[in-house]
């Protein structure tokens, strides 16, 4: 322990300080959320009450929420951002009403001076905050404007034939929300979300969403703080890179211990335990869900060009875009998590001296069947909610929460959390035997801690409720999406790989321990407070922006050395004479390093500075980062774990080189083509539109249905097809292992 004392102290200090920051400013998120108030007319009559806004939030959740457009920039990209769209339409309606009232002309027919006068009135009407006694007074003209937008939205979310082509452009099914009273509540929720984007915080010149979205009509432009912290984030990034290169050059640990030649793979000498043999079905489910996810992903992408049809067949009444996208995202979380679960459960008996703890196989089997129940149950619940079969009051619990990546109903979410805790306990039972052994146990300690973090921190997603304010929900949602996945999964992967490579005699334990402890500190110092970079415009204050921009810049710092990490993984296959049998798992880990650098590093920083995200939040630049980071990093990690475990579960069998080459390179090439041929150019085009005209236009059908953007979406099919072929080849390889007589 003494040898690693500085590293442990650094890790503990990082965790304490960073979680203190995250917790302290989390309290600020609660305190400073935009208020849900009663809206009255000038006579004091309540025209939009708080209860109807909350009911509207529930109705929005039940139809898929963030899977049907977005609110405050978070959600899907085909339909509009409803808060930006509502705001712009209401502003335009208000200007027309005032132009007619004052000048008896249409707004377009006014001269420059008249337009300027109306814009002064508009900004005063919308930016001033007059909340008093939990009430906000709406003028008669503003109520007329609200009524016009509400009528349009009610028709859009119903089945009015005049809006059919627009529903197709937005990839919305007919009668998205059939009940008229529910649509009225939904309108009130969308109005409130737009109101928060236009209304200044008390004592501030910025709105509740830090002036997002960009809307020139009321001077919703970046604040001075936005620009300052954007510049600061770049400076912090450069300083961090310089310090990292300096310290890694002068003080970085090198693996200078000479490895003892080993004639045979040490793990292949071990007899598989019953619990390890039971993991074959985990590998099957991992790749089966992966195959399903990429197929439904291609299906979902096709909706962006045909809206309600799949090559002329109208499937939107059965599997609409919102449901297909929900399943696509939910399946990705399930299969990646299952791959990680399998890796941990495989290593537990090895750590325990090559034997199962008591009833370990029973625990592994029960966990597997609970996983199947969870997947099927949550998918059915999401279908019933979006199909409007499940009552809205049950949807949050059994159907669809409406929040991206945590779409599954709360009951299913609790089952998933319980399953992760059971997995954690199964691992710790195996780790307990390892702690009884003599020798250096520092690597095992960090491995165990990462397993506990993976098991417990998903529970953060249970801390918000059905009616929680959106900023509060976003705070806890990103604890799961950012901190649980991007933080603790990363540490768990690093620790588990280090343990495997040490067990195989490919690296020294001392070097692996130093590297794992140092990596954990680097991941966490930026990753924990960096969670706030998702909340710049989610109804939070300037300190949240400052913390998020500063610390999330540090997340990119360790990624600059990933070229060296990729080389180290490549070199491992030559470390021992037999190590070439690990070629394909190692290639997957090389891919992880590449996509971590590009997807998390380059594409991640593209949307990281506040000034950048102000204009491109919710555009197609976001799925560029999401696909490259989630699949490119964590997907390939899970696939690497699958092939690593499969190497030992299917002893005596060899990889089919043709299947694996097509699979590996197909997945990488397909992902790259999807990004460079379609998502990235569309995102860049939208960014210019957002800069010049506003967020509403960048997300509008008017822009996205232009022929050249349609062609770019069709081009995505090339990358999608190659990626799907690669995924099917990987699945075929596993089936070949499983049904080979030698198995």
Describe these PLM feature segments.
Residues 1-49:
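Post-cleavage N-terminal segment of exported redox proteins
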Residues 1-7, 219-224, 268-279, 404-405, ...:
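Short, Lys/Arg-rich N-terminal segment immediately upstream of the first membrane anchor
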Residues 8-28, 60, 68, 203, ...:
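Hydrophobic cores of alpha-helical transmembrane segments in multi-pass integral membrane proteins
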Residues 31-227:
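Soluble extramembrane regions of membrane proteins in the secretory/endomembrane system
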Residues 41-44, 309-323, 615-618:
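Perimembrane loop-to-helix junctions flanking transmembrane segments
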Residues 91, 256-269, 442-445, 695-698:
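Juxtamembrane inter-helical linkers in multi-pass membrane proteins
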Residues 253-279, 355-358, 572-582:
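Membrane-interfacial, low-structure loops and terminal tails that flank and connect transmembrane helices
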Residues 401-410, 439, 472-482, 540-551, ...:
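Non-cytosolic membrane-interface motifs at loop->transmembrane helix junctions
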